[in-house]
Every structure is written in structure tokens, then in C-alpha cells.
Amino acid sequence: MKYVRCVLLTGALFNIAAGLKCADSKVLSRYKVSQHAAKGKFTESTPPSETTDFWWINLCEEHSEPVPDKCKDDAMFCHRQQVKLDDGKEYVTQVFDVPRNQEVDVEELRDGFQVSFTGKWGERERKVKVRYTCADDKAEDEVSAEGAFGAHTTPVEVALRGPSGCIQATEKSSGIGGWITWLVIYAVLLTLIYLLAKSYMSVGHGSMQDFREEFVERSTNLVSSLPEFAKEVMGKVVGGGPSSRGGYSAV
């Protein structure tokens, strides 16, 4: 597969141990990859036979899904090639799987992230690169690959497009909205502290009943003045000038 890698300036390679929860990874924990396993199937006419490649990827151990036929039970990645002859008989010709105890490199990209790892296929070691990109409109990840698996000198490159490459909803909702929420909370707390302090100073050594009445009165006055205050502020913001107020008559 050919693509241009656009690495974020703040992005770095994070090395984690495969089999650990994706929640423990600084990058993977931001995405929905722990909620899905991806699988793909590609059939090609190879006279006098028909060749089918099956791909299966379950990167995070948080997501439980049965491993496909012929793949090892501890696999997080599996490729199986199957040949169907013209007489209808089918034979599995290749199986390449990578166990969960293999180390995984995680790289955050501009439009998703990429994981890479190495597995053993017979006497050879094969490098695998899997790139995840977001597609909110898809319920499952679409898997695509380029080039013949038998090209031993090149990495196995697989692309996943779907929900796994999308950022978690909690991450999307953070930002300016989150800051505004905290500012409102702090404003309410500071106002409450101010009212309590002023009420206490006003009653001095009075009873608890006096303190409560003073606090309720101050709080009521504050709440009742908020609409007029907001109206005055909005008037100044939109250029209407200060609100009209009645003055005091000289006696």
C-alpha cells in the first residue's frame, strides 16, 4: 500500500508490549480501537485456481473475539491464504499470525495512527504495518492490503478504515466547552464563598437563625439582580450603551 505518512510534530513512536490493554497506551487510549476487531477477505482469480486472502486484526485485549480458523489462539494478527481448485476442493496454503506477546510500535499520524510489529513465518521474520483511519459512517472496519503476501523482502502493509481509527467521544467533547464548564463551576463556588463570608460578617455573633436569614436574603437579592445585570452587559456588548436607570431625587 502506498501512502504518505504525515506524522504530527508532537507525535512520537511509543513502544508498548502487545497484549497489554490499549488503555495503557498514551495514543491508543484516545481511539476506539479497543472496541473492534477488523477482518477482511479478498478473492483473486489465479487459474486454474482461485486464491482468497483472509485478514484478521484484534489489537487490544479489551476486545474479546474468537480467533479465526487455523490461527493460533493467542494471535492478535492473522493472515490466511486459501486456494480453491477447479474441482471445488479448498486448501489452506499459508498462515501467518503474530502473538500478543510481540512488541508493538504505535505512531500517531495526522489522520489516525499506525501500528507496526514483527512476526515469524517459518524461518523468516515478517514486518507488519497497519494503518488506522477514521470513518464515522461505518459500523465495522474495512480492511485493504496491497501487494502479494509472498514478497518476503517488503513489509506486510494493511490499511483499516472505520470506527477503530476514530477518536473517543469524550476526547472530542473536551476543549473549549470543557474549559467553559470549569469556569462556570469556579464562578459558582467563589460566589457561594463570598455570600457565606459576607453573611457571617454581617450577623457577627448572632445566632444560626440570623446567619441563615442573612444568607438567604443576600442570595435572593443576587439572583433577582442577575437578569438586569445580564441585560446591561448585553446592551454594552451590542453597543446599546448602559441601561437606563432611575436616579435619586435631591431632597
From Swiss-Prot:
- Positions on the Cytoplasmic side per record topology: 197-251
A biological process (GO) annotation for this entry?
cytoplasm to vacuole targeting by the Cvt pathway
Please give the Gene Ontology molecular function terms for this protein. Answer: phosphatidylinositol-3-phosphate binding
| Membrane topology, Lumenal segments | 20-175
Keywords of this entry: Autophagy, Cytoplasmic vesicle, Disulfide bond, Golgi apparatus, Membrane, Mitochondrion, Protein transport, Signal, Transmembrane, Transmembrane helix, Transport
Q: How does it sit in the membrane?
A: Single-pass type I membrane protein; Single-pass membrane protein
Membrane-spanning segments: 176-196
Which residue numbers delimit the MRH domain? 20-168
Q: Return the similarity comment.
A: Belongs to the ATG27 family.
Q: What does this protein do?
A: Effector of VPS34 phosphatidylinositol 3-phosphate kinase signaling. Regulates the cytoplasm to vacuole transport (Cvt) vesicle formation. Plays a role in ATG protein retrieval from the pre-autophagosomal structure (PAS) and is especially required for autophagy-dependent cycling of ATG9.
Identify this protein by name: Autophagy-related protein 27
